[in-house]
């Protein structure tokens, strides 16, 4: 018999015993009571009483009602020490036969298993080891767990099981709970920041007839009542800019985007983005906003501007570096023989890319080739927080052209730890230029570029009504959460990541 078969046999045996206990509970009446009310969380008790002297605490006779899942139990004859876990943390219980009504210790407490959810009433005291504990006087089983918890000494170590059965991961791993608490604080902090700056939170369509706002492959679905193919949105950008045209001059949205692309440690097909738009601002203002926001999040969440991620340490209290895409490519590509002139001539750029082993697509112009060279030689060097600026117009179809050099745009990408965290630019508000760039994207799609943008005629019409000078930015919430939680994979910060079917 294999080790796996032995484990399954043991599991089936334990579940059978637990089901028999549940059957006995059903025979007595309500097996899942719902009248117990907790009046305090475990961590609140620790915060208030951990430093309290044991004798003084005993004299106070603090009564509490706590509830949670049984994580450990240690029987000692007529008494049992139990640790329960609630959403805030853990608290120890002292359950003694002599402190409970007759028969309760044997007939009820004796049947409890790890994983069961209980509610108790009692008074606080300190053990000989000075551990805050609840001396229970009333107990109640609230939920009988039919399956055992993962091994208490090794926890849940199988990564795939952690992602597929996130509930077990959250029960077993304190670090995972901490990660998702940090993620929640990131979202709350962003919302608070933009509302304090006078932005209005809005919601735009998830189902779109024309998927716009980014270069990506969309998910396709069909609306039966309208008998029309629709797309899960890849970005809310074009709808948000319509709102600026309509007079809502500061808007933001925190919501999901969908892209029918690969899965990796940095990519999930369903992900959360912040997008915001600010009239009468340019991309320099947005870079300033971003530095301020990330600094504030670090202080609020971590208590410091120092953010540690893997082997790296970032100080969000310092100004972020700002460098153009062309300058970064020359700076970090010098050891590969790249010079400035290679990036301003199509033939030289194409030859340079091919020398680097880049497969140049037929639909690429000079801008796309230069961007591919940057990604090959420079992107992974942008470790410290860096704003990469002045992207080629060819790869920035929604961004405003630079006044001094119309071949590039007033655009930036934020890189931290060699990864793109955000993307923003001064918005293109020239309707005729936008129409021409959409046409160029259509030509690229017809030439085989699956990720080229669709043309949105209605958006062009909106621009023809007049978009004020505006700047907009998108920040990846998942990647920000990875950063503040020091999580190596995007799956670690998404509660239920996309997984291949078994």
UniProtKB/Swiss-Prot annotation:
<feature type="binding site">
    <location>
        <position position="420"/>
    </location>
    <ligand>
        <name>Mg(2+) 2</name>
    </ligand>
</feature>
<keyword id="KW-0460">Magnesium</keyword>
<dbReference type="InterPro" id="IPR004364">
    <property type="entry name" value="Aa-tRNA-synt_II"/>
</dbReference>
<dbReference type="InterPro" id="IPR045864">
    <property type="entry name" value="aa-tRNA-synth_II/BPL/LPL"/>
</dbReference>
<feature type="binding site">
    <location>
        <position position="420"/>
    </location>
    <ligand>
        <name>Mg(2+) 1</name>
    </ligand>
</feature>
<dbReference type="InterPro" id="IPR004365">
    <property type="entry name" value="NA-bd_OB_tRNA"/>
</dbReference>
<keyword id="KW-0547">Nucleotide-binding</keyword>
<comment type="similarity">
    <text>Belongs to the class-II aminoacyl-tRNA synthetase family.</text>
</comment>
<keyword id="KW-0479">Metal-binding</keyword>
<dbReference type="GO" id="GO:0006430">
    <property type="term" value="P:lysyl-tRNA aminoacylation"/>
</dbReference>
<dbReference type="GO" id="GO:0004824">
    <property type="term" value="F:lysine-tRNA ligase activity"/>
</dbReference>
<comment type="subunit">
    <text>Homodimer.</text>
</comment>
<keyword id="KW-0963">Cytoplasm</keyword>
<protein>
    <recommendedName>
        <fullName>Lysine--tRNA ligase</fullName>
        <ecNumber>6.1.1.6</ecNumber>
    </recommendedName>
</protein>
<dbReference type="Pfam" id="PF00152">
    <property type="entry name" value="tRNA-synt_2"/>
</dbReference>
<dbReference type="GO" id="GO:0005829">
    <property type="term" value="C:cytosol"/>
</dbReference>
<dbReference type="GO" id="GO:0000287">
    <property type="term" value="F:magnesium ion binding"/>
</dbReference>
<dbReference type="InterPro" id="IPR002313">
    <property type="entry name" value="Lys-tRNA-ligase_II"/>
</dbReference>
<keyword id="KW-0030">Aminoacyl-tRNA synthetase</keyword>
<dbReference type="GO" id="GO:0000049">
    <property type="term" value="F:tRNA binding"/>
</dbReference>
<dbReference type="Pfam" id="PF01336">
    <property type="entry name" value="tRNA_anti-codon"/>
</dbReference>
<dbReference type="InterPro" id="IPR006195">
    <property type="entry name" value="aa-tRNA-synth_II"/>
</dbReference>
<keyword id="KW-0436">Ligase</keyword>
<dbReference type="InterPro" id="IPR044136">
    <property type="entry name" value="Lys-tRNA-ligase_II_N"/>
</dbReference>
<keyword id="KW-0648">Protein biosynthesis</keyword>
<dbReference type="InterPro" id="IPR018149">
    <property type="entry name" value="Lys-tRNA-synth_II_C"/>
</dbReference>
<dbReference type="GO" id="GO:0005524">
    <property type="term" value="F:ATP binding"/>
</dbReference>
<dbReference type="InterPro" id="IPR012340">
    <property type="entry name" value="NA-bd_OB-fold"/>
</dbReference>
<keyword id="KW-0067">ATP-binding</keyword>
<dbReference type="InterPro" id="IPR034762">
    <property type="entry name" value="Lys-tRNA-ligase_II_bac/euk"/>
</dbReference>
<feature type="binding site">
    <location>
        <position position="413"/>
    </location>
    <ligand>
        <name>Mg(2+) 1</name>
    </ligand>
</feature>
């Amino acid at each position: 018999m294999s080790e796996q078969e032995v484990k399954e046999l043991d599991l089936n045996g334990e579940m059978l015993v637990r089901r028999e206990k549940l059957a006995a509970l059903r025979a007595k009446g309500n097996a899942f009571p719902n009248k117990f009310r907790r009046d305090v969380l475990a961590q609140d008790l620790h915060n208030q009483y951990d430093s309290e002297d044991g004798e003084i605490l005993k004299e106070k006779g603090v009564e509490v009602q706590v509830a949670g899942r049984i994580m450990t139990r240690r029987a000692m004859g007529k008494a049992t020490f139990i640790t329960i876990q609630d959403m805030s943390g853990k608290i120890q219980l002292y359950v003694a036969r002599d402190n409970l009504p007759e028969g309760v210790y044997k007939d009820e407490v004796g049947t409890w298993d790890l994983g069961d959810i209980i509610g108790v009433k009692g008074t606080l005291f300190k053990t000989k080891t000075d551990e805050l504990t609840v001396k229970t006087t009333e107990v109640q089983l609230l939920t009988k767990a039919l399956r055992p918890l993962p091994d208490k000494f090794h926890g849940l170590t199988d990564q795939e099981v952690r992602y597929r059965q996130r509930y077990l991961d959250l029960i077993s791993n304190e670090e995972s709970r901490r990660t998702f608490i940090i993620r929640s604080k990131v979202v709350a902090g962003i919302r608070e920041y933009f509302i304090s700056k006078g932005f209005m939170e809005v919601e735009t369509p998830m189902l779109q007839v024309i998927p716009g706002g980014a270069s990506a492959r969309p998910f396709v679905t069909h609306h039966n009542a309208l008998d029309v193919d629709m797309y899960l949105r890849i970005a809310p950008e074009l709808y948000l800019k319509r709102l600026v045209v309509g007079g809502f001059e500061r808007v933001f949205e925190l919501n999901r985007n969908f892209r029918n692309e690969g899965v990796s440690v940095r990519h999930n097909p369903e992900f959360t983005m912040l997008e915001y738009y600010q009239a009468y601002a340019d991309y320099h203002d947005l870079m300033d906003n971003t530095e301020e926001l990330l600094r504030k999040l670090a202080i609020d969440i971590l208590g410091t501007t120092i953010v540690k991620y893997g082997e790296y340490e970032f100080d969000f209290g310092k100004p972020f570096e700002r460098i153009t895409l062309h300058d970064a490519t020359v700076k970090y590509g010098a050891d590969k023989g790249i010079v400035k002139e290679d990036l301003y001539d199509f033939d030289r750029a194409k030859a340079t890319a091919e020398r680097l082993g880049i497969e140049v697509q037929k639909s690429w112009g000079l801008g796309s080739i230069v961007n591919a060279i940057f990604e090959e030689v420079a992107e992974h060097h942008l470790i410290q927080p860096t704003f990469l600026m002045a992207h080629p117009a060819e790869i920035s179809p929604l961004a405003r052209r630079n006044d001094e050099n119309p071949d590039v745009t007033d655009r930036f990408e934020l890189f931290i730890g060699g990864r793109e965290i955000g993307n923003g630019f001064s918005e293109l508000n020239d309707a005729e230029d936008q129409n021409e760039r959409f046409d160029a994207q259509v030509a690229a799609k017809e030439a085989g570029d699956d990720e080229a943008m669709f043309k949105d005629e209605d958006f062009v019409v909106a621009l023809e009504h007049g978009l004020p000078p505006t700047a907009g930015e998108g920040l990846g919430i998942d990647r920000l959460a990875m950063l503040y939680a020091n999580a190596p994979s995007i799956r670690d910060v998404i509660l239920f990541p996309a997984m291949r079917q078994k």
